[in-house]
């Protein structure tokens, strides 16, 4: 049986796309995924261009594949994702042994691109933006476990000054309302209990409803997803503060299937820096969203994205960011030093902050977040948490593991319960009393109801 190896860089959208690449090649050519690159007949790199030196990292990986290609001439090497969108045919110019180059919106054409390459002997490049077409050509998702991702929209129209996403993934395009619901319903029938709705700006969703001119917003979509039998938990990422409507806030007061955790990127806490970033909201507006959410759910946990060292960031600006992190008490974050991306407005901004200062700021921020994480984890000891059981624990397969609503991994034993009994719990929501907190997980005991 032929095999495909996919290496994924970047966000959850890329993870979702990588799964779809495997699904497409499995449905069309019977390929199965492998974790061993040397066993593969097709090697794909699903790339990300958000961080610094992304292109060079890709070419470095490709360089290592050249020797493998020499040994296996029929090996197919492909580059997809956002670096592919940016670089296009220049990838083949620099690495002529690459067979196919495709963008995020053309991954469904992968079988045709590979067939054309094998037929003509010419490398194939397709980095077009055919709207939402790819979803019409993807095979049904293959379910692995009780949780699944569902992409509901693509692209971004916000054009933040530092970000390449609108240029590499195109502008915002939403999937039709019924298509999303049908996919979620199909997943639920296969045993999925938790869905994560995905989009670059997921709460900018505006899906066409049937043959009418009516448009469903994100809040309405969630309401309908919550009514699908079998779905017990709903997550989403990544949301944008500018699109966080009052309807969406109010939904947290009446939809208990929305988890008690939200990832809402703020990027910074200085209005001057936010304006330079072209984020489209103020610090006060962002805090207002958090305040209204916590009025409905006082113990709601928050995570965020932060950029330190943006051009012009002063010590005072950074102190504002640290103060907000303390005030909101973020539970985990994705934090980075600003890296200028070619072709973005921010790449042309004057930046005189030394690299060492930026690094010190990042380390200070991450240390504070880590303290928050440990404090929150310790605070969960002695509480009873609702856990979605995902399967055997990684370190001890005789135990089970699951996740809390705020994404903590919880391991727990079931003394005296046979394997069949443990297997039946996978995909179920159970109550677990938390007994210990570790740096990256929790431990607990299942609560048996009399």
Curated annotation (Swiss-Prot):
Domain spans labelled TRAM: 378-448
Keywords from the UniProt entry: 4Fe-4S, Cytoplasm, Iron, Iron-sulfur, Metal-binding, S-adenosyl-L-methionine, Transferase, tRNA processing
Gene3D superfamilies listed in its UniProt record: Methylthiotransferase, N-terminal domain, tm_1862 like domain
Enzyme class: transferase
InterPro entries the record matches: Elp3/MiaA/NifB-like_rSAM, Methylthiotransferase, Methylthiotransferase_CS, Methylthiotransferase_N, Methylthiotransferase_N_sf, MiaB_methiolase, rSAM, rSAM_horseshoe
Pfam families tied to this protein: Radical_SAM (PF04055), TRAM (PF01938), UPF0004 (PF00919)
Superkingdom per UniProt: Bacteria
Enzyme Commission code: 2.8.4.3
MTTase N-terminal domain boundaries: 2-119
GO cellular component: cytosol
Chain residues that bind [4Fe-4S] cluster 2: 156, 160, 163
Keyword Nuclease listed: no
Radical SAM core domain: residues covered: 142-375
Protein role: Catalyzes the methylthiolation of N6-(dimethylallyl)adenosine (i(6)A), leading to the formation of 2-methylthio-N6-(dimethylallyl)adenosine (ms(2)i(6)A) at position 37 in tRNAs that read codons beginning with uridine.
Entry's family note: Belongs to the methylthiotransferase family. MiaB subfamily.
Quaternary structure annotation from Swiss-Prot or TrEMBL: Monomer.
Descriptive protein name: tRNA-2-methylthio-N(6)-dimethylallyladenosine synthase
């Amino acid at each position: 049986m032929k095999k495909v190896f996919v290496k994924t860089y970047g966000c959850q959208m890329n993870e979702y796309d990588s799964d779809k690449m495997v699904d497409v090649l499995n449905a069309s050519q019977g390929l199965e995924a492998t974790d061993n690159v040397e066993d593969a007949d097709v090697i794909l790199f699903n790339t990300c261009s958000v961080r610094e030196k992304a292109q060079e990292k890709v070419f470095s990986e490709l360089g290592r594949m050249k020797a493998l290609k020499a040994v296996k001439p029929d090996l197919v090497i492909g580059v997809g994702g956002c670096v592919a969108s940016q670089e296009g045919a220049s990838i083949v110019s620099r690495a002529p042994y690459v067979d196919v180059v495709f963008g995020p919106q053309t991954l469904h054409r992968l079988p045709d691109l590979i067939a054309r390459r094998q037929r003509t002997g010419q490398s194939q490049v397709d980095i077009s933006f055919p709207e939402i077409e790819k979803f019409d050509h993807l095979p049904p998702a293959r379910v692995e476990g009780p949780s699944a991702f569902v992409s509901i929209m693509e692209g971004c129209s916000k054009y933040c000054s530092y970000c390449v996403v609108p240029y590499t993934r195109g502008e915002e395009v939403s999937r039709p309302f019924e298509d999303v619901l049908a996919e979620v319903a199909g997943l639920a029938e296969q045993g999925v209990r938790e869905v994560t709705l995905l989009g670059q700006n997921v709460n900018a969703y505006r899906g066409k409803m049937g043959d009418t001119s009516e448009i469903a917003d994100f809040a309405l979509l969630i309401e309908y997803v919550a009514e699908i039998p079998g779905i017990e938990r709903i997550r989403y990422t990544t949301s944008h503060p500018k699109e966080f409507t009052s309807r969406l806030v109010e939904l947290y007061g009446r939809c208990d299937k929305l988890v008690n955790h939200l990832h809402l990127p703020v990027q910074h806490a200085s209005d001057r820096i936010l304006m330079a970033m072209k984020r489209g909201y103020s610090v006060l507006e962002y805090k207002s969203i958090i305040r209204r959410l916590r009025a409905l759910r006082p113990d709601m946990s928050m995570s965020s994205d932060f950029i330190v060292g943006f051009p012009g960031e002063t010590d005072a600006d950074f102190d504002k960011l640290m103060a907000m992190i303390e005030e909101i008490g973020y539970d985990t974050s994705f934090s980075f030093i600003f890296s200028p991306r070619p072709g973005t407005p921010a790449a042309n901004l004057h930046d005189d902050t030394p690299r060492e200062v930026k690094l010190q700021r990042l380390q200070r921020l991450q240390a504070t977040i880590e303290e928050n994480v440990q404090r929150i984890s310790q605070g969960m000891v002695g509480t009873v948490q609702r856990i979605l059981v995902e399967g055997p624990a990684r370190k001890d397969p005789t135990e089970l593991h699951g996740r809390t609503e705020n994404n903590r991994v919880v391991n727990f034993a079931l003394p005296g319960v046979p394997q069949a009994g443990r297997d039946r719990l996978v995909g179920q929501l159970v109550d677990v009393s938390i007994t210990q907190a570790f740096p990256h997980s929790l431990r607990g005991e299942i609560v048996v109801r009399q």
